[in-house]
Every structure is written in structure tokens, then in C-alpha cells.
Curated annotation (Swiss-Prot):
Modified residues (N6-(pyridoxal phosphate)lysine): 210
Signal sequence segment: none
Catalytic activity line of the entry: O-acetyl-L-homoserine + hydrogen sulfide = L-homocysteine + acetate
EC number per UniProt: 2.5.1.-
Pathway, per record: Amino-acid biosynthesis; L-methionine biosynthesis via de novo pathway; L-homocysteine from O-acetyl-L-homoserine: step 1/1
Known cofactor(s): pyridoxal 5'-phosphate
Keywords assigned by UniProt, alphabetized: Amino-acid biosynthesis, Methionine biosynthesis, Pyridoxal phosphate, Transferase
InterPro entries: Cys/Met-Metab_PyrdxlP-dep_enz, Cys_met_metab_PP, OAc-hSer/O-AcSer_sulfhydrylase, PyrdxlP-dep_Trfase, PyrdxlP-dep_Trfase_major, PyrdxlP-dep_Trfase_small
Species the sequence originates in: Thermotoga maritima (strain ATCC 43589 / DSM 3109 / JCM 10099 / NBRC 100826 / MSB8)
Name of the protein in question: O-acetyl-L-homoserine sulfhydrylase
Length: 430
């Protein structure tokens, strides 16, 4: 079915699963908790292994429940295909390894989640020989100056976590494409409220663990392929030339515009094995069904909390994508048309010790290392999520010693504010 004629919410409820499962008529997507699938005959098995016919062989590389999730997120993003993997970190890693190898370079914005920064700064280089150059992405000129003949991709986060900066996607996409490389965007914190493919992105990655799942129950990642990038421009021979590990297949010739995502599945997922479990896929499918409703409430609550914090005597500063002091405010207003996200950061007067006292005084808000839960969450990034970074590296990613990060939930906003207020007051007590 052509899902492009349907609205976002209709696709979120129906795409990838129509008509209802033939054998039973199940309206809900069934959980196919199986490792493998019976072939009809020897010829059928041979065709599947030769990639001559779509179908399922082994759950490590494909599963009917997981496939529904992949088709649904591809429909929502209006891409040609998607791959579900075991975590957001796996999604980011595969997205890079699919097109880069030893000696290649990636140009990345510096406003990154701490786990991504560590992956790029240390693990990718030490294990794969891939060099990541970090630049201040708030000025597109920095991106262009960092690109060389060895560059294989430009990487951005939609809203830097926790710096909350928003890049000029269209300007950066133009630069990347002029140099013959794709733009990869991590849209984890902005599903529904930002559509990366509409603004020049070629590949989108998600930690589905966050807002897509929405309830803090499951770990998973997603890679979505726009199908618009020209992989035949001479910079990506692995997508064009025969793959000796898979019968000499040329991904571009065989899969056309879906070459990137097909290679990611048949090569990386097959060999590295970070597959998503069918049960987690089922939970993410449920999450997609209410994603837009939750994101609207997250954003609505966040705006009210920003206003509360701005006037609180125990707060020294507040940051949000459209805050007056945020240097990329105009980009947020330009690109984020359905809301400005659920992440709010602020400083508690009294610095690190006062911040610790604030965290320990919360009663309703949960202190934990996650974002995107339906419940409101709080953390002190400098001592937790970004602890492995040096103080200089923390500052480059937007983390200050006094920073508190809130992931605003969908509770009654008055209750969230009441908990913030009492904890802030206690943080100032001698």
C-alpha cells in the first residue's frame, strides 16, 4: 500500500501491517518469537539465500514483527527502508561502519550525547581506524572546513544533548552534498516534531529506547534510509562493486535506491548480530501508535516548566531550544514546527553541591540515566552521562558543572512544577 497519501497518525497506526495477519485475523501485530522459518522447499531456500526473493531465514537478519516496525518507521519518515537493531548505540555504529573504514573520516557536530562522543572519539578509531573530526556545528562553515577527500559522512544531532543547539540542516546538507557525502542525523529527541528527510538528511538514526518507546521498557535502535543519496559518485565502492561475502552482489545494482539499508542488513547485521528482539519490536510498535500525542504533551509541559524555572530564585540560568539566550534559537523556530522537545537544562545556584542536593530532594521526578520516558526524569550530566569526558570535552558538548538536565514527562504539569519547586528550595538551605 502507498502510505504517502495518509497522514502521520494513520501511518503510525497502520503502516507495515495490512491486512490483518492472514492465519488468525489478528488486528494487533503478532509477536513472532522464533529463531527461524520453515522453507517451502529446497528451491525456495536457495532463492532466499541468493536474495532473489524476499522472506525470512533467521531472526538475526529478519523477523516478521521486527519487519512491521521497520516498515512503519520508514513510512513515517518517508524513506525507502529501515533497519531495527538492538540499541541506539548499535544504530549509530552500523550507520557509520556501513560506509566508512580504516583511514576514512567523519565530520561530526560536537554537541553530542556522551555515549556517542565516546564512540566517535575512542572506540571507532581504536577498533576501526575511523577518524571523527568534531566541530562547532552551529556555524556551517566549520563543517565545510573540516571536510577532506577522506570524509565519508557528516553527522548531526537534531537537538544537541544536552546543549540543546539546533543546526542549520539545509545549509549543512548543501555543503555535505556538494562534497559528495551523506548527511546522517540522529533524531532521537525529536521524532514527529522534526522530519530530517524534508531538510536534506540522507540517513536518520534513532535510539528507539527514548521517545519512540516512550515508557522506559525497551532498548532498541533504528536506521532509516531516505533512498535519495547517489552512492555511485565514486566515494563508496563497497556499495557499487561486487561484495565477495555475499555471492558478489552489487548493492546498488540489486537494491537500487535501497542499497544502503540493504547492505546494512545483509552485511553488518548478519556479521555483527545486534538484532532487535521481537518482543521489543512489539513494544516499539505500540509506542509509535501514540508518539504524536505524547510528543505534543511533552513539548507543552516543557514550555510551561521553562517559564517556571526562568523566574525561580534558586535558578541561575535556563536553556531550551527557543530560549532567548540559545544561539541557535532561529534554527529551532525554523525547523521544529510541531514543538521544541522535552529536554530542558538549567543551573542551580550554588553549583555542583546545590545541584546534588536538588537531585536528592526530588520526590515525584525520577533520578536516572534516560530521556524520553512518559515520566519526568532528572540527572546531573557532568557526574553521570558525560562523566567519562574531560572537563574541556564536557564544555565542548555543552555540559557545565552546575547543569541539571530534565526530560519532561506527560504528568500533570502542576505536579511536576511542585516537585521542582520544593527540591529547588531545599537546594538553597544551609
Amino acid at each position: 500500500m502507498d502510505w504517502k497519501k495518509y497522514g502521520y497518525n494513520t501511518r503510525a497506526l497502520h503502516a507495515g501491517y495490512e491486512p490483518p495477519e492472514q492465519a488468525t485475523g489478528s488486528r494487533a501485530v503478532p509477536i513472532y518469537q522464533t529463531t527461524s522459518y520453515v522453507f517451502r522447499d529446497s528451491d525456495h531456500a536457495a532463492r532466499l539465500f541468493a536474495l532473489e526473493e524476499p522472506g525470512f531465514i533467521y531472526t538475526r537478519i529478519g523477523n516478521p514483527t521486527v519487519s512491521v516496525l521497520e516498515e512503519r518507521i520508514a513510512a513515517l519518515e518517508e524513506g525507502v527502508g529501515a533497519l531495527a537493531v538492538a540499541s541506539g548505540q548499535a544504530a549509530i555504529t552500523y550507520a557509520i561502519l556501513n560506509i566508512a573504514g580504516p583511514g576514512d573520516e567523519i565530520v561530526s557536530g560536537s554537541a553530542l550525547y556522551g555515549g556517542t562522543y565516546n564512540l566517535f572519539r575512542h572506540t571507532l578509531y581504536k577498533k576501526s581506524g575511523i577518524i571523527v573530526k568534531f566541530v562547532d556545528e552551529t556555524d556551517p562553515k566549520n563543517i565545510e572546513e573540516a571536510i577532506t577527500e577522506k570524509t565519508k559522512a557528516v553527522y548531526l544531532e537534531t537537538i544537541g544533548n544536552p546543549g540543546l543547539t539546533v543546526p542549520d540542516f539545509e545549509a549543512i546538507a548543501e555543503i555535505a552534498h556538494r562534497h559528495g557525502v551523506p548527511l546522517i542525523v540522529d533524531n532521537t529527541v525529536a521524532p514527529y516534531i522534526f522530519r530530517p528527510f524534508e531538510h536534506g538528511a540522507d540517513i536518520v538514526v534513532y535510539s528507539a529506547t527514548k521517545f519512540i518507546g516512550g515508557h522506559g521498557t525497551s532498548i532498541g535502535g533504528l536506521i532509516v534510509d531516505s533512498g535519495k543519496f547517489d552512492w555511485t559518485n565514486g566515494k563508496f565502492p563497497e556499495l557499487v562493486e561486487p561484495d565477495p561475502s555475499y555471492h558478489g552482489v552489487s548493492y546498488v545494482e540489486t537494491f537500487k535506491e535501497a542499497a544502503y539499508i540493504a547492505k546494512c542488513r545483509t552485511q553488518l547485521l548478519r556479521d555483527l548480530g545486534s538484532c532487535m528482539s521481537p518482543f521489543n519490536a512489539f513494544l516499539f510498535i505500540l509506542g509509535l501508535e501514540t508518539l504524536s500525542l505524547r510528543m505534543k504533551k511533552h513539548c507543552e509541559n516543557a514550555l510551561k516548566i521553562v517559564e517556571f524555572l526562568k523566574s525561580h530564585p534558586a535558578v541561575s540560568w535556563v536553556n531550551y531550544p527557543i530560549a532567548e539566550g540559545n544561539k541557535t534559537r532561529e534554527n529551532a523556530l525554523k525547523y521544529l514546527k510541531e514543538g521544541y522537545g522535552a529536554i530542558v537544562t538549567f543551573g542551580v545556584k550554588g553549583g555542583k553541591e546545590a545541584g546534588k542536593k536538588f537531585i536528592d530532594s526530588l520526590t515525584l521526578i525520577s533520578h536516572l540515566a534516560n530521556i524520553g520516558d512518559a515520566r519526568t526524569l532528572a540527572i546531573h550530566p557532568a557526574s553521570t552521562t558525560h562523566q567519562q569526558l574531560t572537563e574541556e570535552e564536557q564544555l565542548k558538548t555543552g555540559v557545565t558543572p552546575d547543569m541539571i538536565r530534565l526530560s519532561v514527562g506527560i504528568e500533570d504539569v502542576e505536579d511536576i512544577i511542585a516537585d521542582l519547586d520544593q527540591a529547588l528550595r531545599k537546594s538553597q538551605e544551609g
